[in-house]
From Swiss-Prot:
One of its GO terms (cellular component) is extracellular region. It is found in: Secreted; Target cell membrane. The keyword Secreted applies. It comes from the Eukaryota. Antibacterial peptide with amphipathic alpha-helical structure. Shows selective growth inhibitory activity against the Gram-negative bacteria E.coli (MIC=25 uM) Has a weak hemolytic activity against human erythrocytes (LC(50)>100 uM). Is very weakly active against S.aureus (MIC=200 uM). One of its GO terms (biological process) is innate immune response. Belongs to the frog skin active peptide (FSAP) family. Alyteserin-1 subfamily. The modification Asparagine amide is found at residue 23. This is Alyteserin-1d. Keywords: Amidation, Amphibian defense peptide, Antibiotic, Antimicrobial, Immunity, Innate immunity, Membrane, Secreted, Target cell membrane, Target membrane. Its main location: secreted.
Amino acid sequence: GLKDIFKAGLGSLVKNIAAHVAN
């Protein structure tokens, strides 16, 4: 549902931020 899409998007965003911080 919509919550799943939101969770997936949020998880992707967190991963991207974590990748930038790691670099």
